[in-house]
Amino acid sequence: MRAVQYRTIGSEPEVVEVPTPDPGPGQVRLRVSAAGLCHSDSFVMGLPEEQYVYGLPLTLGHEGAGVVDALGEGVTGVEVGEPMAVYGPWGCGLCHACAKGAENYCPRAAELGIAPPGLGAPGALAEYMIVDDVRHLVPLGDLDPVATVSLTDAGLTPYHAIVSSLDALPAGSTAVVIGAGGLGHVASRSCGRSPAPPSSRWT
């Protein structure tokens, strides 16, 4: 299969041929329909060698969506052919942080060798990717993977900020989004669906 990999510190990413991965026990293989690019991809490739911790070569892409293509042993709850988005923060799934839905704060991920897609594990800038657990798949139903893939990160970030602030935003209050770039636009639209109407300040 083809994949976009960062292969040498300081170099441009390359489109290369790599073996198509097989899902192991508990894993799901996704045929990628869409992958998003993020500032984090640029950040990772801009790190100097002494700060780079992700391993090489690295298949990029932590925003991914596609169709379930193959199931590893013991996988239940999903079917081959189902369209899914990939939830990017991966943790152990067992600790207090993971139980609260905060897998990005999992204290055991590093010691267990768990890394998010595109930020350690092979990511979505490939024809196929492995998702380590079905809990990291979000059913898309009739939604278009291309139209929704950026919600897995660029949408999730402002959504989390808004949901975390709802106690301070009673009905009739006003939310101000400062910096209405890509994530700011998502925040404004998300605020419009929350109890507080949006007000944007362009900076």
Question: Language-model segments: which ranges?
Answer:
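Conserved hydrophobic helix-helix packing surfaces used for dimerization/oligomerization
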Residues: 3, 174-175, 199
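Short Gly/Pro-enriched turn/cap motifs at secondary-structure boundaries
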Residues: 19-20, 55-61, 116-121, 128
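Glycine-rich beta-strand-centered segment in the early N-terminal region that forms part
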Residues: 21-35, 49-99, 141-143
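Cytochrome P450 core scaffold surrounding the K-helix E-X-X-R motif
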Residues: 40-46
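Conserved S-adenosyl-L-methionine
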Residues: 193-198
